[in-house]
């Protein structure tokens, strides 16, 4: 008689444990599970726990060489999703030992690496993760964080202003630098490389870095403010990426940029470590996020990618705009904006926050609002995002009838007007449509932008 019995067995016998008390050191996950017809919810939830931790489809004799109880993921709670048929939220607890310290890459390989192709599930979405302090403390996190960034830039009490240089592809390095200079001179704090500007035949990275640095220094000299341009260091290899970051540091510029999903978490964490060691700020673009987070029933919610970025490291990250979207979306967006900026975030299902998250003083990340916003949105953006944010107007700056610099002036005037109005106790949501026209009286550039 053999000591174990091979053969396919129900996952729920081992991995569904409704009595389990979660530990402070567990990583907790909330999955939205859509089982195939005929598969019970408990079995589907247990299957997720098994396939993303120790399980395989059958009993193997080597199971006897380890303590399964110590290492297995456990589905400890299942609830039906209100308003959806055959959708469940399955809560899974993973023991800390399953994960390599300081590796977002390993965390994702474990939790979402294999289980999403699982046959018994029609669809699967990771909605949220609770990262325990015992795990988050193994990460450096953002290179600098919000407070250090404000001190470096000497800019307080207002959101920061940015602009993506367009047309994003096709400009020569010199003309690109000229566009950067115009925007910074006009009053923006930052300009930005587009996410797909890396090092193409029409503009190699080194030439762009040089002309942008020249633009930054010229604009700083004229305005007396510290300026920056997000120099995109994303490259085909980690070595090349670091080489570009080193060159940016040698030029003395304040900030570089990375596409963290296309570049990958390993590359991103390497760059974040370099940035902290060398005093560079790190701007993160989320290119490719919609591939992962757009489907409501499959993939990962962006709040998970945002938490992962805070652990891997970045000082800014794009976070949608909220303006003009649906109400529910607004609450969800503000939920993960808080997860990026705050130290301690209470569980709040109405904002999509499934777990209380304690970051224990890991530096925060500035959310970047960008995409289709213009000066009329300024009061709403100032109110919704508050001071700790970067507001990015691409076409909203460069589309100004008089050119880039006046477009930048218009944005800066609108922002300062909104901040002043707010500080005087006015209600931006209600009076926004009066505040901007009032400011137009003092600024022909803003008046032209509003027409």
From Swiss-Prot:
UniProt protein name: Ribulose bisphosphate carboxylase large chain
Annotated residues for binding of substrate: 114, 164, 168, 286, 318, 370
Family: Belongs to the RuBisCO large chain family. Type I subfamily.
Major enzyme class: lyase
Gene3D superfamilies named among the record's database cross-references: Ribulose bisphosphate carboxylase, large subunit, C-terminal domain (3.20.20.110), RuBisCO large subunit, N-terminal domain (3.30.70.150)
SUPFAM superfamilies named among the record's database cross-references: RuBisCo, C-terminal domain (SSF51649), RuBisCO, large subunit, small (N-terminal) domain (SSF54966)
Record-linked PANTHER family: RIBULOSE BISPHOSPHATE CARBOXYLASE, RIBULOSE BISPHOSPHATE CARBOXYLASE LARGE CHAIN
Cofactor(s) in the UniProt record: Mg(2+)
Keyword S-adenosyl-L-methionine among UniProt keywords: no
Residues where N6,N6,N6-trimethyllysine is found: 5
GO BP terms in the entry: photorespiration; reductive pentose-phosphate cycle
GO molecular function: magnesium ion binding; monooxygenase activity; ribulose-bisphosphate carboxylase activity
Organism: Aristea glauca
GO cellular component: chloroplast
InterPro entries per UniProt: RuBisCO (IPR033966), RuBisCo_large_chain_AS (IPR020878), RuBisCO_lsu_C (IPR000685), RuBisCO_lsu_C_sf (IPR036376), RuBisCO_lsu_fd_N (IPR017443), RuBisCO_lsu_N_sf (IPR036422), RuBisCO_lsuI (IPR020888)
Catalytic activity: 2 (2R)-3-phosphoglycerate + 2 H(+) = D-ribulose 1,5-bisphosphate + CO2 + H2O; D-ribulose 1,5-bisphosphate + O2 = 2-phosphoglycolate + (2R)-3-phosphoglycerate + 2 H(+)
Record-listed N6-carboxylysine modification sites: 192
Role this protein plays: RuBisCO catalyzes two reactions: the carboxylation of D-ribulose 1,5-bisphosphate, the primary event in carbon dioxide fixation, as well as the oxidative fragmentation of the pentose substrate in the photorespiration process. Both reactions occur simultaneously and in competition at the same active site.
Site (Transition state stabilizer): 325
Keyword Disulfide bond: yes
Pfam families: RuBisCO_large, RuBisCO_large_N
EC annotation from Swiss-Prot or TrEMBL: 4.1.1.39
